[in-house]
Design a protein with these regions (language model features):
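OB-fold single-stranded nucleic acid-binding module
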Residues: 4-52
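ATP/Mg2+ or Mg2+-diphosphate-binding catalytic cores
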Residues: 244-252
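Short, basic/aromatic beta-hairpin or loop at an interaction surface
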Residues: 1
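Divalent metal-dependent catalytic cores for phosphoryl transfer on phosphate-bearing substrates
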Residues: 107-111, 117, 128-245
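Acidic/His-rich, divalent-metal-binding segments that scaffold phosphate/diphosphate chemistry
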Residues: 46-167
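N-terminal intrinsically disordered, cationic/polar leader segments
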Residues: 226, 253-256, 263-265
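Conserved NTP-handling cores and scaffolds of large molecular machines
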Residues: 22, 42, 78, 94, ...
Length: 265
């Protein structure tokens, strides 16, 4: 196979999954794999041989198709016609990507189908919390569904995740706002005031109320969306830190996102 390197370089890109056939042999007292044939591995052609992308990279433990169906139920509960059309348009237009996309590279839900798991979890949390407050239920639900939508274009969803050019230069909140605005143009008579509120939810959800920062959550729904996101992300991060800690000590080490020893029991 080393005789065909120039041709193979044209055939593959970094991060492609490969299907190989060949045999092993002993060379200089070491076992070597001699590859006779190599192709890009796809489910379409190699699924019958057991190829499954979810077995190659870290993936959600939940079934993506079932999560998608659960999410559609929540979206279809939105009674505001324009808002329902907007959310459905955004999600259905990117369904294929949403089913597999991670929610981040190094933070919470940083695995295959992580984005879908994250937004579904936040929507389920929102449904439970909304009855306790005098807030617009549908605005909160729409908020948790839209605040992370920019990650679909911020990072790549292949076997090796990395930031896209747009992700590096703009960031996912700006990208999410663009996605919102593009979709709103396709919904006839979409309310201007509602769009402005949705934009604010997207731009303010990560703000930690630090001095001299812009776009702080400035109405009750924005504040609730902010805390739903923060609570869910931080708890998942803490769970991951505990699960990944290999020591038998009662506490984890200090070198983690929270910079503190976390009780594991």
């Amino acid at each position: 196979i080393w005789d065909n390197i120039s041709e193979l370089n044209k055939k593959f890109e970094s991060g492609n999954a490969e299907a190989e056939s060949g045999y092993t042999e002993i060379y200089l007292d070491n076992l070597h794999l001699v590859i006779k044939k190599i192709n890009e591995a796809t489910v379409q052609y190699y699924g019958r041989y057991g190829f499954d992308p979810a077995k190659i990279v870290p993936s959600s433990k939940k079934n993506p198709q079932k999560m998608w169906e659960q999410l559609l139920i929540i979206i279809n509960e939105i009674k505001n016609k324009e808002l329902h059309k907007l959310i459905l348009l955004i999600y259905k237009s990117d369904k294929k990507k949403i089913l597999i996309h991670p929610a981040s590279i190094k933070s919470s839900y940083n695995y295959r189908s992580g984005f879908l798991e994250q937004v579904l979890t936040m929507a389920q949390i929102a449904k439970k919390l909304v009855p306790f407050y005098k807030v617009d239920r549908e605005l909160v639900i729409a908020g948790v569904l839209l605040i992370k939508i920019g990650v679909l274009k911020e990072i790549n969803s292949g076997y090796i995740t990395d930031y896209s050019k747009k992700g590096k230069l703009l960031g996912q909140s700006v990208i999410a706002r663009d996605i919102l605005n593009d979709a709103a143009k396709k919904v006839r008579n979409f309310p201007t005031d509602l769009k402005i509120k949705l934009e604010h939810l997207i731009l303010s959800y990560e703000n930690n109320f630090q001095p001299n920062t812009s776009y702080k959550p400035s109405f009750p729904e924005a504040l609730l969306v902010h805390y739903i996101y923060k609570m869910n992300s931080n708890i998942r991060l803490m769970e991951t830190i505990i699960a990944d800690d290999g020591d038998e000590n009662e506490f984890t080490g200090l070198h983690n996102h929270f910079r503190l020893p976390i009780l594991k029991v």
